[in-house]
Amino acid sequence: MTDSKKYILTLDEGTTSARALITDKQGNIIAVEQSEFTQYFPKEGWVEHDAIEIWNTQRSALVQVLNKSGIDPSQIEAIGITNQRETAVIWNKETGLPIYNAIVWQDQRTADYCQTFDKDTLEMVKQRSGLIINPYFSGTKVKWILDNVPNARQLAKEGKLMFGTINTWLIYRLTGGEVFVTDHTNAQRTLLYNIHTNDWDDELLKLFDIPRNILPEIKSCSEVYGYTFKGLFSKGNEQRIKIASSIGDQQSALFGQLCLEKGQVKVTYGTGCFILTNTGEEIVKSNHGLLTTVAYSFKDKVYYALEGSVMIAGAAVQWLRDNLRIVYNAIETEWYADQVKDDRRVYVVPSFTGLGSPYWDSFSRGAIFGLDRGTRREHIVRATLEAIVYQANDVVDAMRKDMKKPIEIFKVDGGAANNKFLMQFQSNISQSKVIKPTNVETTAMGAAFMVGLAVGYWENAEELKKTYKVHFELTPELSKPEVDKLIKGWKVAVQRTFKWVEEIE
């Protein structure tokens, strides 16, 4: 049995910040440290990060969480990584430096290119990758960098470039450049991975004109990849720690919520909103605008999921605060929403960077419908929170159709899961029970569980289940006819934003 004074260290690299968390054997979070990094918007629809800044902030969070907790690096059993997916970095193998900023998952610069493929090609890509051709995924971002950064194609030809999503970049840096790997969940989100062979796909590489030699080796989500370099924690500290997990953030939340059985669903409310349902070892093809994705993997097995990705969720609340300036902070939104009824039927469609699942419309843009002279700030705040729910419900409804079964319970996490108004409205609209765990750090816990299983810190899923505690459960308070009326208004509103950019140009 592992010593109880040993801990798991998880690096949670998100869209706006890098975090480090220390977990004990009972699943308690001992300490958390967070460092924000800069968002770059060089052109309309473009979103970039500085990969060096990401590394520096992640390393800073790692060192600070150890200092803050008083835990020595020698007490860390192993390190796991969970990360924002799809964000693409290409760096020079000889210098270790990026040749361009990391292009973020939200970036839309390749939207026009994604419209150039014929129906047969789109179907081939979906069949092989489980995904659709969309700017969201890494493949078109990688192509853009290779095509637009001077000399990039030549350097790739000479074998001097390396591509990775953020997990690969961090593992490379943490190991001092010794290890160049990714995991099944992150690899699959590139558009370059075959979900049937669980390897890079030559046809997809050819389609996007991406050389195989720049790609990392694919490993499972739960195994030892290598060790941290000497001096990572401080100049005099030569401790080397195992890196034993890598998993995309949404898949990590699914595992952290212990949705380990087929049909179990989790909803994460972060910058975007991401809904996954476990389909076990079965690859389920969606006919309703969802993605087939890898849920998680071990050395001997790969598990799959259906996923719906909503581009704007918590970011809509940031928009209320930072752009419209009608709330001072996110916490206030719950109070404002409770001040008014929904009888004015105001709808906000926050498609600021297009619509994700199940619509997949890169040319939609945000809109507010149903305004009249009586509309107040409270109505707009309420409608913005409701929009997060409506978008999540569109995905849940598609899952019901693809799975051909009801979804009666889903587990929630993420910052907005603390908003009781939003969670009750989610239960109402989806006509399902909503369960929120006491430990809201489910994304970090998923990676921690993966690490623990890899190194024997936890023996099996039954041990993991003992760490899960429920904070609250909510059940629907509206009837189905009432809900149907509200959803009808949402459907009209969202459809009126379709193809907006295309139609006005």
Curated annotation (Swiss-Prot):
It comes from the Bacteria. ADP binds at residues 15, 19, 271, 314, 415, 419. GO terms for biological process: glycerol catabolic process; glycerol metabolic process; glycerol-3-phosphate metabolic process. It catalyses: glycerol + ATP = sn-glycerol 3-phosphate + ADP + H(+). The keyword Transferase applies. It is an enzyme of class 2 (transferase). InterPro entries: ATPase_NBD, Carb_kinase_FGGY, Carb_kinase_FGGY_CS, FGGY_C, FGGY_N, Glycerol_kin. Glycerol binds at residues 85-86, 136, 249-250. The keyword Nucleotide-binding applies. Inhibited by fructose 1,6-bisphosphate (FBP). Its EC number is 2.7.1.30. Keywords: ATP-binding, Glycerol metabolism, Kinase, Nucleotide-binding, Transferase. Pfam families: FGGY_C, FGGY_N. CDD domains: FGGY_EcGK_like (cd07786). Sn-glycerol 3-phosphate binds at residues 15, 85-86, 136, 249. ATP binds at residues 15-17, 271, 314, 318, 415. One of its GO terms (molecular function) is glycerol kinase activity. GO terms for cellular component: cytosol. Pathway: Polyol metabolism; glycerol degradation via glycerol kinase pathway; sn-glycerol 3-phosphate from glycerol: step 1/1. Key enzyme in the regulation of glycerol uptake and metabolism. Catalyzes the phosphorylation of glycerol to yield sn-glycerol 3-phosphate. Belongs to the FGGY kinase family. This is Glycerol kinase. It comes from Mycoplasma mycoides subsp. mycoides SC (strain CCUG 32753 / NCTC 10114 / PG1).
